[in-house]
C-alpha cells in the first residue's frame, strides 16, 4: 500500500501548503512588516496633508487625504474578511496589491505636499 506522506494530490510535488486559517511564521512576519509599513506611511501622509506646507491646509491636500483614507478603509475591510476566513487564500495577493497601490499613492502625495521636484 502507498505511504500517505508521498501523496501529491494532483500537484507537481509534495503539497505542504497550509489549509484555511493556518499561517506560517514567515507569512505572519510578512503580514506584520507590510501592514506596519503601510500604516506608518498612511499616518505620515495624513499628518502631512494637514500640516504642510502651511496652516490652513490646501484643499487639494485634503482631497489626497480623503482618497487615501477611502482606499485604506477598503483594504482594512478585505483584511478583516481574510482574517475571518471569509476569503480564500488566493485573495492575499489582491490585498498585497492594494496595499502596494496605497503605498505608491502615499509616496506621490508626500512628494506633492513637500514640493519635491520644483
Curated annotation (Swiss-Prot):
Its membrane topology: Multi-pass membrane protein
One Gene Ontology cellular component: membrane
Main location: membrane
Protein keywords: Acetylation, Membrane, Transmembrane, Transmembrane helix
PTM annotation (N-acetylmethionine): residues: 1
Membrane spanning stretches: 32-52, 62-82, 94-114
Subcellular location: Membrane
Alphabetized Pfam families for the sequence: DUF2678
Protein family (similarity comment): Belongs to the TMEM243 family.
PANTHER family: TRANSMEMBRANE PROTEIN 243
Protein name: Transmembrane protein 243
Amino acid at each position: 500500500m502507498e505511504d500517505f506522506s508521498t501523496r501529491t494530490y494532483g500537484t507537481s510535488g509534495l503539497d505542504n501548503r497550509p489549509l484555511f486559517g493556518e499561517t506560517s511564521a514567515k507569512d505572519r512576519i510578512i503580514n506584520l512588516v507590510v501592514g506596519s509599513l503601510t500604516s506608518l506611511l498612511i499616518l505620515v501622509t495624513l499628518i502631512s496633508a494637514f500640516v504642510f506646507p502651511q496652516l490652513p491646509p490646501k484643499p487639494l491636500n485634503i482631497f489626497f487625504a480623503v482618497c487615501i483614507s477611502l482606499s485604506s478603509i477598503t483594504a482594512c475591510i478585505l483584511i478583516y474578511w481574510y482574517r475571518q476566513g471569509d476569503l480564500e487564500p488566493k485573495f492575499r495577493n489582491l490585498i498585497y496589491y492594494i496595499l502596494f497601490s496605497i503605498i505608491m499613492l502615499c509616496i506621490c502625495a508626500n512628494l506633492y505636499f513637500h514640493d519635491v521636484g520644483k
